[in-house]
From Swiss-Prot:
NCBIfam families: rplV_bact
Subunit structure as annotated in this protein's UniProt entry: Part of the 50S ribosomal subunit.
Protein name: Large ribosomal subunit protein uL22
Keyword presence, Cell inner membrane: no
SUPFAM superfamilies: Ribosomal protein L22
CDD domains given in the database record: Ribosomal_L22
InterPro entries the record matches: Ribosomal_uL22, Ribosomal_uL22_bac/chlpt-type, Ribosomal_uL22_bac/org-type, Ribosomal_uL22_CS, Ribosomal_uL22_sf
Organism: Corynebacterium diphtheriae (strain ATCC 700971 / NCTC 13129 / Biotype gravis)
GO cellular component: cytosolic large ribosomal subunit
Superkingdom of this protein's organism: Bacteria
A Pfam family it matches: Ribosomal_L22
Keywords, alphabetical: Ribonucleoprotein, Ribosomal protein, RNA-binding, rRNA-binding
Length: 120
């Protein structure tokens, strides 16, 4: 039990962003420091960057408050978006038809790890 905890995670579930679009944004921040990741996400034009930024900030806060890790040494070690449940909606079309619209959701998970100052 002498091993110190060096990682923290945060998850946002049922986010109304398609997993494919969320993964585009997540790929930008994987492996970056938390400060750098938040700076990238702040100016990313994609709509998915806002919920991803919230999860990165939450993971950093979890590391800081729950495990006493230094925010400046945190790196996004793991980041992924899994598919959540799909909401099905119907769009009325001509001549009494109805087409199905799939509104996809994502479960976004970010893991941050404390890295030594000399590493990298």
């Amino acid at each position: 039990m002498s091993e110190a905890i060096t990682s923290a995670r945060a998850t946002a579930r049922f986010v109304r962003v398609s997993p494919m679009k969320a993964r585009r944004v997540i790929d930008l921040v994987r492996g970056k420091s938390v400060e750098e990741a938040l700076a990238i996400l702040k100016y990313a034009p994609q709509a998915a960057s806002e919920p991803v930024a919230k999860v990165v900030a939450s993971a950093a806060a979890n590391a800081e408050n729950n495990f006493g890790l230094d925010r400046r040494s945190l790196v996004v070690s793991e980041a992924f978006a899994d598919e959540g449940p799909t909401m099905r909606r119907f769009s009325p079309r001509a001549q009494g038809r109805a087409f199905q619209i799939r509104k996809r959701t994502s479960h976004i998970t970010i893991v941050v790890e404390s890295q030594k100052e000399g590493a990298k």
